Amino acid sequence: MPRYKLTIEYDGTNFVGWQQQDNGPSVQGALQTAALNFVGAHVACMAAGRTDSGVHALGQVAHLDLPSHYDTDTIRDALNAHLRPAPIAVLDVERVSEQFHARFSATRRTYRYVIVNRRTPLTVKRGRAWLVPRPLDENAMLEASKHLLGKHDFTSFRAAECQAKSAVKTLDTLESVRTGDHINIT
């Protein structure tokens, strides 16, 4: 079966997360249903990482094995058509080898957190940023962030139901850029 790599973005507000669950709609479930409607057979869709409930993605990588060969633009367009009106978009599709695995072939992941540092409430960024109405000490934040760089055991930060094999992770970079009242942390 030919394997295809998907690059997708989604608004996770109304999803229980990436992984298919019984307690509500998931991104994985929506993609698998779209693939079923496209090819007429169940297709498992695996991601590089499983986002939690309410988490958005701008470049999530996933893969799926289709029962036959298709043009990559056809796959992208068909999945997007079957995903409507869900807030999920397949941005790119690439044919890859059967050895490629979205999760295990990933060499790094990038996360972005947005802080809006002002007294007025969020409107457009609601659900996409953390509003902090008090002044922030950016120098103290930068100094504290240096302690997170490198290899550390993040057990204390894991959810009880976390299924990752290890809580030991390596943080290569941590950058904080302020533009007006927005602080972007990557």
Predicted regions and their residues:
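Structured-RNA-binding interfaces characteristic of tRNA pseudouridine synthases
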Residues: 1-186
